[in-house]
Curated annotation (Swiss-Prot):
It catalyses: tRNA(His) + L-histidine + ATP = L-histidyl-tRNA(His) + AMP + diphosphate + H(+). Pfam families: HGTP_anticodon, tRNA-synt_His. Homodimer. SUPFAM superfamilies: Class II aaRS ABD-related (SSF52954), Class II aaRS and biotin synthetases (SSF55681). Belongs to the class-II aminoacyl-tRNA synthetase family. The keyword Aminoacyl-tRNA synthetase applies. This is Histidine--tRNA ligase. GO terms for biological process: histidyl-tRNA aminoacylation. InterPro entries: aa-tRNA-synth_II, aa-tRNA-synth_II/BPL/LPL, Anticodon-bd, Anticodon-bd_dom_sf, His-tRNA-ligase, HisRS-like_core, HisRS/HisZ, HisRS_anticodon. It comes from the Bacteria. GO terms for cellular component: cytoplasm. Keywords: Aminoacyl-tRNA synthetase, ATP-binding, Cytoplasm, Ligase, Nucleotide-binding, Protein biosynthesis. The keyword Glycoprotein does not apply.
Amino acid sequence: MAKQIQAIRGMNDCLPTQSALWQKVEGTIKQVVSAYGYNEIRMPIVESTHLFKRAIGEVTDVVEKEMYTFEDRNGDSLTLRPEGTAGCVRAGIQNGLLYNQEQRLWYIGPMFRYERPQKGRYRQFHQVGVEVFGLNGPDVDAELIMMTARLWRELGINQHVRLELNSIGSLDARATYREALIAFLEQHLEVLDEDCKRRMHTNPLRVLDTKNPAVQEILVDAPKLSEYLDDDSKAHFAGLCELLDAAGIEYQVNERLVRGLDYYNRTVFEWITESLGAQGTVCGGGRYDGLVEQLGGKATPAVGFAMGVERLVLLMETLELADVRRSVDAYVVTVGEGTMMAGMKLAEKLRENVPGLRVMNHFGGGNFKKQFKRADNVGAAIALVLGENEIADNTVVVKDLRGGEQTTMAQDEVTAKLAELI
């Protein structure tokens, strides 16, 4: 026997037993973003490596250690996208969507990062992104946060997530703060681990979100970024907080929240859960007003967020909220000469007249017992039984597979009966 080929580590199959919950989560997300008037955009999975180096930052963990990068046959360096914002901005610039325009976009699809696989963190993961271009006020920042809050309510997880936000100011303000932070960290080198020492000179703000308890302890006395903010960033953040207060959205200001990508400025936020252990961030985003210009477009304000579908699915499973509609509503059982095609015609008629009804025909023969067992296995609520007598009388036996009751009715009446299931 030939050796079995396994899936790549950290890249998982989504099996039929899981896909119904995925469809529920993805469908709910699409309904919510559409309710705000946002339009879908679809970008390639593979982009030029230079795009991510320029957008995310060459000294970030993503670019240095986590990207799947390769050369094609022309010698061009290509990368499987590790996130969606850079590609969305590239598409907007290339297709003339951004200059002097307002765009509200969303996308969904697989992303790739070479990380150590663990619960809630995978090498291929599915991300939903929402991006707004051309608006620079705190009102659109607030709308995005309100959108995520609505999504949590729709999914039933709103009591299990909390919002943290911060302002990291302008590039100039951060540059001044960066020097002050480095000076502080240099006074505590004996406490810093190797990762923090490396970040101290490449991306010192990332030291603020370290998980090392000893480093966290000294950071209590570190300079505060809020004390270095420019006046415009302070006013923008105050306006955002005022709007969230008016909307009744609870939040916590976390002055150590900086996000992991270099393109952010001003607003940054995360939705966090305590139910998934170390992988507690279910959604993160912020403002990136300089990225469009950085990637070759005209200066355009922008803000957005992203969330991982796997993590949302895992959270719903953990909270036992994974109740989804069965995959089959009615199962057609046929026994006797000439009954197969009659059963298929009945199923087609029901699909046409009852939108959303899921009807499965039995194939492969077998007696009633075998077919009813199969109907149970697929989770059908009702069996529709057609034998030679039913075809002669133009009737059908409708059996409730949950309660066991059954009744015989004219085939023309079955449509109304099954419509009650939807």
